[in-house]
């Protein structure tokens, strides 16, 4: 494949460099352990072979490849993780990672690889399929002119290339924010959904969300222009395709940049609903979860209970305050819980599930005061679109403080799945598409696109490549993708092939094989590769923790300089920044 690549530019503090420092640190710790406990030497042999950091470029890329694949697939719905879809995602990552690592940092300070992985994670959380996620990753490479759509078609597949073509069509829609009145914005949203692949629209929405999360480097005027575009076009569009959480986050970020003072006021008030250092919604969530788990009657009907908590979005709250003239404490549904029950009966799970929902409502009434006129029984009387759930509102005020009402939704796992699946058709109206026939047609387009992707990625059984079982975990999946001949071992030839696909010399494969092959038999077993992946997972978690601690330290240190009369805090602050910037 002929790929035009820019001159390699060193990327400071890239993830793979940090990962390999962690590997070396693990090795030192294990050596110290061995001095105190010689008997641990045999037990640590396999891990030590992995802990020796493979400093070659190929080894670093394999670490990045395995880590990225696992991070994305563990968030995906198992329905999408067939053999074909896993291979597709793996091929896209192999093609993209070497190129993305060689590109310069973006204007927001992130590496292109970091941005590509952020997009893929959002899409995985939205339960998009491997083809959409692969196209999203590759779009960053194509956008940098490092590879063409035609090359993607030849090396990845026609379906992915088509999606890339669609996403760039969507990105190039011309419009100006100064003419985006309500009618024009509604027409533009309808144009999006009528003339473009719905999956490309979702990819564009995710790209816009990622952009909105990193606006601080832009001038104030540009931040406001983008935020207005999001409120007029992208947030309602996200609602129209059923991505409600994405829509709410887009609204809140836009609100923060357009109306910073109002946002701070509402945000401070919402955060004031805390019990000590813990958000109030978490307190209620834990209280309800304990009560449900302790109830013996409910325990006979359900295997498990899940509870989700949420605060009303800042933008949604602002609209209610301005529209109705209410005070913040008079806004209902600021707090919300959703109880999802998993019935333990297979034969009569519908009947048992309904009884469990009503039993849950009785337990809730024993904890808080119910507001009767706010109760809506959509289980006994489902909505026209088939929606079934039990809605309640309760008063959680105590003797010390009056609090807003809390809304609680109660449903079974099946009811929740049906509600989410039906979100798209219902939200097409809220997204500004008020024609029922048009909404029904657009829903059919969305379902057809999903069916087409499922058919395209359907597994074809063969003797050479076995389908993944539903119980296959993330580590086994990567091992099977590298074990191309299916003999249960990764040979030096198979490892070398991956290295070459990543653009690294074959010698790196030999070095990495020596480091990972603990029994020196010339190949990697699933256990040896599993040890390697555990190290990768361990290091990625510690890198995230390190960044978290750095932020906390920065916050603490920046709050204290005015109290420092000796200059020691400023000195320590500078030394800390210098150390962190060199590691």
From Swiss-Prot:
<dbReference type="InterPro" id="IPR002048">
    <property type="entry name" value="EF_hand_dom"/>
</dbReference>
<keyword id="KW-0808">Transferase</keyword>
<feature type="binding site">
    <location>
        <position position="489"/>
    </location>
    <ligand>
        <name>Ca(2+) 1</name>
    </ligand>
</feature>
<feature type="binding site">
    <location>
        <position position="485"/>
    </location>
    <ligand>
        <name>Ca(2+) 1</name>
    </ligand>
</feature>
<keyword id="KW-0150">Chloroplast</keyword>
<comment type="function">
    <text>Possesses calcium-dependent ppGpp (guanosine 3'-diphosphate 5'-diphosphate) synthetase activity in vitro and is able to functionally complement E.coli relA mutants. Plays an important role in the timing adjustment of pistil and pollen maturation required for successful pollination. May be involved in a rapid plant ppGpp-mediated response to pathogens and other stresses.</text>
</comment>
<keyword id="KW-0547">Nucleotide-binding</keyword>
<dbReference type="GO" id="GO:0009507">
    <property type="term" value="C:chloroplast"/>
</dbReference>
<keyword id="KW-0677">Repeat</keyword>
<feature type="site" description="Required for ppGpp synthetase activity">
    <location>
        <position position="309"/>
    </location>
</feature>
<feature type="binding site">
    <location>
        <position position="494"/>
    </location>
    <ligand>
        <name>Ca(2+) 1</name>
    </ligand>
</feature>
<dbReference type="GO" id="GO:0005524">
    <property type="term" value="F:ATP binding"/>
</dbReference>
<feature type="binding site">
    <location>
        <position position="521"/>
    </location>
    <ligand>
        <name>Ca(2+) 2</name>
    </ligand>
</feature>
<keyword id="KW-0067">ATP-binding</keyword>
<dbReference type="GO" id="GO:0005525">
    <property type="term" value="F:GTP binding"/>
</dbReference>
<feature type="binding site">
    <location>
        <position position="523"/>
    </location>
    <ligand>
        <name>Ca(2+) 2</name>
    </ligand>
</feature>
<keyword id="KW-0106">Calcium</keyword>
<keyword id="KW-0418">Kinase</keyword>
<dbReference type="GO" id="GO:0008728">
    <property type="term" value="F:GTP diphosphokinase activity"/>
</dbReference>
<keyword id="KW-0342">GTP-binding</keyword>
<dbReference type="Pfam" id="PF13499">
    <property type="entry name" value="EF-hand_7"/>
</dbReference>
<dbReference type="Pfam" id="PF04607">
    <property type="entry name" value="RelA_SpoT"/>
</dbReference>
<feature type="domain" description="EF-hand 1">
    <location>
        <begin position="470"/>
        <end position="505"/>
    </location>
</feature>
<keyword id="KW-0479">Metal-binding</keyword>
<dbReference type="InterPro" id="IPR043519">
    <property type="entry name" value="NT_sf"/>
</dbReference>
<dbReference type="GO" id="GO:0005509">
    <property type="term" value="F:calcium ion binding"/>
</dbReference>
<keyword id="KW-0346">Stress response</keyword>
<protein>
    <recommendedName>
        <fullName>Probable GTP diphosphokinase CRSH, chloroplastic</fullName>
        <ecNumber>2.7.6.5</ecNumber>
    </recommendedName>
</protein>
<feature type="domain" description="HD">
    <location>
        <begin position="112"/>
        <end position="212"/>
    </location>
</feature>
<feature type="binding site">
    <location>
        <position position="528"/>
    </location>
    <ligand>
        <name>Ca(2+) 2</name>
    </ligand>
</feature>
<feature type="binding site">
    <location>
        <position position="487"/>
    </location>
    <ligand>
        <name>Ca(2+) 1</name>
    </ligand>
</feature>
<feature type="binding site">
    <location>
        <position position="483"/>
    </location>
    <ligand>
        <name>Ca(2+) 1</name>
    </ligand>
</feature>
<keyword id="KW-0934">Plastid</keyword>
<comment type="similarity">
    <text>Belongs to the RelA/SpoT family.</text>
</comment>
<dbReference type="InterPro" id="IPR018247">
    <property type="entry name" value="EF_Hand_1_Ca_BS"/>
</dbReference>
<feature type="domain" description="EF-hand 2">
    <location>
        <begin position="507"/>
        <end position="539"/>
    </location>
</feature>
<dbReference type="InterPro" id="IPR007685">
    <property type="entry name" value="RelA_SpoT"/>
</dbReference>
<keyword id="KW-0809">Transit peptide</keyword>
<dbReference type="InterPro" id="IPR006674">
    <property type="entry name" value="HD_domain"/>
</dbReference>
<dbReference type="InterPro" id="IPR011992">
    <property type="entry name" value="EF-hand-dom_pair"/>
</dbReference>
<dbReference type="GO" id="GO:0015969">
    <property type="term" value="P:guanosine tetraphosphate metabolic process"/>
</dbReference>
<dbReference type="Pfam" id="PF13328">
    <property type="entry name" value="HD_4"/>
</dbReference>
